[in-house]
Amino acid sequence: MLTAKYVDLAIQSAKEAFPQWSSLAVPKRAEIMFRYRTLLEQNMDAIARLITLENGKTLEEARGDIRRGFEVVEFACGISQLYKGESLAQVAQNIDGQTIREPLGVCVGISPYNFPAMVPMWMFPLAIACGNTFVLKPSEKVPLTAIRLAELFQEAGLPDGMFNIVHGGKEVVDALCSHPDVAAISFVGSSHVAKHVYTL
Protein backbone atom coordinates (compact mmCIF):
# COMPACT_ATOMS: atom_id res chain seq x y z
CA MET A 1 0.00 0.00 0.00
CA LEU A 2 1.16 3.50 -0.72
CA THR A 3 1.76 6.26 1.77
CA ALA A 4 1.04 9.97 1.62
CA LYS A 5 4.54 10.51 0.21
CA TYR A 6 3.69 8.51 -2.90
CA VAL A 7 0.32 10.19 -3.24
CA ASP A 8 2.16 13.51 -3.34
CA LEU A 9 4.45 12.19 -6.10
CA ALA A 10 1.42 11.13 -8.18
CA ILE A 11 -0.26 14.49 -7.71
CA GLN A 12 2.94 16.36 -8.55
CA SER A 13 3.27 14.29 -11.72
CA ALA A 14 -0.29 15.21 -12.70
CA LYS A 15 0.27 18.86 -11.80
CA GLU A 16 3.42 19.08 -13.93
CA ALA A 17 1.65 17.42 -16.87
CA PHE A 18 -1.41 19.67 -16.68
CA PRO A 19 -0.13 22.75 -18.60
CA GLN A 20 0.90 20.67 -21.62
CA TRP A 21 -2.29 18.59 -21.67
CA SER A 22 -4.74 21.42 -21.03
CA SER A 23 -3.22 23.50 -23.84
CA LEU A 24 -3.43 20.64 -26.36
CA ALA A 25 -6.07 21.31 -29.00
CA VAL A 26 -9.39 19.64 -28.18
CA PRO A 27 -9.47 17.67 -31.49
CA LYS A 28 -6.04 16.22 -30.61
CA ARG A 29 -7.36 15.07 -27.24
CA ALA A 30 -10.35 13.56 -29.07
CA GLU A 31 -7.97 11.60 -31.35
CA ILE A 32 -6.43 9.96 -28.29
CA MET A 33 -9.90 9.19 -26.93
CA PHE A 34 -10.86 7.50 -30.23
CA ARG A 35 -7.69 5.39 -30.14
CA TYR A 36 -8.44 4.49 -26.52
CA ARG A 37 -11.96 3.48 -27.49
CA THR A 38 -10.58 1.17 -30.18
CA LEU A 39 -8.09 -0.46 -27.80
CA LEU A 40 -10.79 -0.98 -25.18
CA GLU A 41 -13.04 -2.63 -27.73
CA GLN A 42 -10.21 -4.93 -28.86
CA ASN A 43 -9.38 -5.86 -25.25
CA MET A 44 -12.89 -6.01 -23.81
CA ASP A 45 -12.95 -9.79 -23.27
CA ALA A 46 -9.50 -9.78 -21.66
CA ILE A 47 -10.54 -6.98 -19.30
CA ALA A 48 -13.75 -8.86 -18.48
CA ARG A 49 -11.69 -11.95 -17.59
CA LEU A 50 -9.47 -9.78 -15.39
CA ILE A 51 -12.54 -8.41 -13.59
CA THR A 52 -13.76 -11.99 -13.06
CA LEU A 53 -10.35 -12.99 -11.70
CA GLU A 54 -10.01 -10.20 -9.16
CA ASN A 55 -13.65 -9.41 -8.35
CA GLY A 56 -15.39 -12.77 -8.67
CA LYS A 57 -18.13 -11.64 -11.05
CA THR A 58 -19.40 -14.01 -13.68
CA LEU A 59 -17.92 -13.34 -17.09
CA GLU A 60 -21.25 -11.97 -18.32
CA GLU A 61 -21.46 -9.55 -15.36
CA ALA A 62 -17.87 -8.49 -15.97
CA ARG A 63 -18.65 -7.81 -19.62
CA GLY A 64 -21.54 -5.60 -18.50
CA ASP A 65 -19.19 -3.76 -16.14
CA ILE A 66 -16.69 -2.92 -18.88
CA ARG A 67 -19.45 -2.23 -21.43
CA ARG A 68 -21.01 0.49 -19.23
CA GLY A 69 -17.62 2.14 -18.82
CA PHE A 70 -16.95 1.81 -22.54
CA GLU A 71 -20.09 3.83 -23.23
CA VAL A 72 -18.61 6.76 -21.29
CA VAL A 73 -15.42 6.58 -23.37
CA GLU A 74 -17.56 6.66 -26.52
CA PHE A 75 -19.32 9.74 -25.17
CA ALA A 76 -15.95 11.37 -24.39
CA CYS A 77 -14.88 10.83 -28.01
CA GLY A 78 -17.34 13.60 -28.85
CA ILE A 79 -15.46 16.11 -26.72
CA SER A 80 -14.98 18.45 -29.68
CA GLN A 81 -18.74 19.05 -29.65
CA LEU A 82 -19.33 18.61 -25.92
CA TYR A 83 -16.67 21.13 -24.92
CA LYS A 84 -18.04 24.01 -26.96
CA GLY A 85 -18.97 27.14 -25.08
CA GLU A 86 -22.06 29.22 -25.62
CA SER A 87 -22.70 32.82 -26.50
CA LEU A 88 -25.75 35.01 -26.39
CA ALA A 89 -25.83 38.45 -27.94
CA GLN A 90 -27.64 41.28 -26.19
CA VAL A 91 -28.19 39.65 -22.80
CA ALA A 92 -28.80 43.24 -21.75
CA GLN A 93 -28.35 46.56 -23.52
CA ASN A 94 -24.93 46.40 -25.22
CA ILE A 95 -23.96 43.32 -23.19
CA ASP A 96 -23.19 39.93 -24.69
CA GLY A 97 -22.86 36.75 -22.65
CA GLN A 98 -20.27 34.09 -23.33
CA THR A 99 -19.51 30.76 -21.64
CA ILE A 100 -16.06 29.24 -22.00
CA ARG A 101 -15.25 25.80 -20.62
CA GLU A 102 -11.81 25.42 -19.09
CA PRO A 103 -10.07 22.48 -17.40
CA LEU A 104 -9.73 22.62 -13.61
CA GLY A 105 -6.35 20.96 -13.06
CA VAL A 106 -5.60 17.80 -11.11
CA CYS A 107 -8.74 15.72 -10.56
CA VAL A 108 -9.06 12.71 -8.26
CA GLY A 109 -11.33 9.69 -8.48
CA ILE A 110 -12.00 7.27 -5.63
CA SER A 111 -13.88 4.14 -6.69
CA PRO A 112 -15.30 1.02 -4.99
CA TYR A 113 -14.54 -2.67 -5.51
CA ASN A 114 -17.89 -3.80 -6.90
CA PHE A 115 -17.57 -2.18 -10.35
CA PRO A 116 -13.81 -2.06 -11.04
CA ALA A 117 -14.15 -0.80 -14.63
CA MET A 118 -17.49 0.98 -14.84
CA VAL A 119 -17.16 3.38 -11.91
CA PRO A 120 -13.60 4.57 -12.63
CA MET A 121 -14.65 5.04 -16.24
CA TRP A 122 -17.50 7.27 -15.11
CA MET A 123 -14.74 9.57 -13.88
CA PHE A 124 -11.47 9.66 -15.75
CA PRO A 125 -12.35 9.60 -19.49
CA LEU A 126 -14.39 12.81 -19.42
CA ALA A 127 -12.07 14.56 -16.96
CA ILE A 128 -9.06 13.79 -19.15
CA ALA A 129 -10.85 14.58 -22.41
CA CYS A 130 -11.75 17.99 -20.95
CA GLY A 131 -8.06 18.77 -20.42
CA ASN A 132 -7.63 17.79 -16.79
CA THR A 133 -5.08 15.37 -15.41
CA PHE A 134 -6.27 12.55 -13.18
CA VAL A 135 -5.25 10.51 -10.15
CA LEU A 136 -7.35 7.39 -9.60
CA LYS A 137 -7.55 5.48 -6.31
CA PRO A 138 -9.37 2.24 -7.07
CA SER A 139 -10.41 -0.08 -4.29
CA GLU A 140 -7.41 -1.93 -2.91
CA LYS A 141 -9.46 -5.12 -3.45
CA VAL A 142 -9.43 -4.72 -7.27
CA PRO A 143 -6.18 -3.02 -8.34
CA LEU A 144 -5.53 -4.88 -11.60
CA THR A 145 -8.43 -3.63 -13.70
CA ALA A 146 -7.50 0.01 -13.11
CA ILE A 147 -3.90 -0.68 -14.05
CA ARG A 148 -4.96 -2.33 -17.30
CA LEU A 149 -7.28 0.56 -18.17
CA ALA A 150 -4.38 2.97 -17.64
CA GLU A 151 -1.98 0.86 -19.71
CA LEU A 152 -4.37 0.90 -22.65
CA PHE A 153 -4.80 4.67 -22.34
CA GLN A 154 -1.03 5.07 -22.50
CA GLU A 155 -0.94 2.77 -25.55
CA ALA A 156 -3.51 5.08 -27.14
CA GLY A 157 -1.03 7.94 -26.87
CA LEU A 158 -1.91 9.57 -23.56
CA PRO A 159 1.32 11.29 -22.43
CA ASP A 160 3.02 10.46 -19.15
CA GLY A 161 1.64 12.12 -16.05
CA MET A 162 -1.89 12.59 -17.37
CA PHE A 163 -3.37 9.53 -15.67
CA ASN A 164 -1.90 8.25 -12.42
CA ILE A 165 -3.03 5.42 -10.15
CA VAL A 166 -2.42 5.13 -6.41
CA HIS A 167 -3.39 2.14 -4.29
CA GLY A 168 -4.19 2.03 -0.61
CA GLY A 169 -6.74 2.58 2.08
CA LYS A 170 -7.71 5.42 4.39
CA GLU A 171 -4.26 7.03 4.54
CA VAL A 172 -4.21 7.37 0.76
CA VAL A 173 -7.78 8.73 0.63
CA ASP A 174 -6.93 11.27 3.33
CA ALA A 175 -3.81 12.39 1.46
CA LEU A 176 -5.68 12.74 -1.83
CA CYS A 177 -8.64 14.63 -0.39
CA SER A 178 -6.58 17.06 1.67
CA HIS A 179 -3.91 17.80 -0.94
CA PRO A 180 -3.80 21.51 -1.85
CA ASP A 181 -3.12 20.81 -5.55
CA VAL A 182 -6.28 18.75 -6.09
CA ALA A 183 -8.93 20.78 -7.93
CA ALA A 184 -11.81 18.28 -7.91
CA ILE A 185 -12.74 14.94 -6.35
CA SER A 186 -15.17 12.35 -7.69
CA PHE A 187 -16.24 9.62 -5.27
CA VAL A 188 -18.43 6.53 -5.44
CA GLY A 189 -18.67 4.32 -2.36
CA SER A 190 -20.40 3.82 0.95
CA SER A 191 -22.21 6.62 2.78
CA HIS A 192 -19.80 6.24 5.71
CA VAL A 193 -16.73 6.85 3.53
CA ALA A 194 -18.54 9.57 1.56
CA LYS A 195 -19.09 11.53 4.77
CA HIS A 196 -15.42 11.15 5.63
CA VAL A 197 -14.33 12.32 2.16
CA TYR A 198 -16.71 15.29 2.38
CA THR A 199 -15.25 16.43 5.70
CA LEU A 200 -11.71 16.50 4.31
Residue map of PLM features:
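Residue-level signal for inorganic ion chemistry
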Residues: A14, R29, I51, V73, ...
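A general structural signal for well-ordered alpha-helical segments in protein cores
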Residues: I11, M33, G69-F70, A146, ...
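Short phosphate-engaging motifs
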Residues: Y6, N43, I47, G69, ...
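Rossmann-like NAD(P) dinucleotide-binding subdomain of oxidoreductase/dehydrogenase enzymes
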Residues: G85-L200
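Long amphipathic alpha-helix in the N-terminal Rossmann-like dinucleotide-binding domain
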Residues: Q12, F34-M44, L59-Y83
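Short, structured beta/alpha segment
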Residues: M1-R49, L53
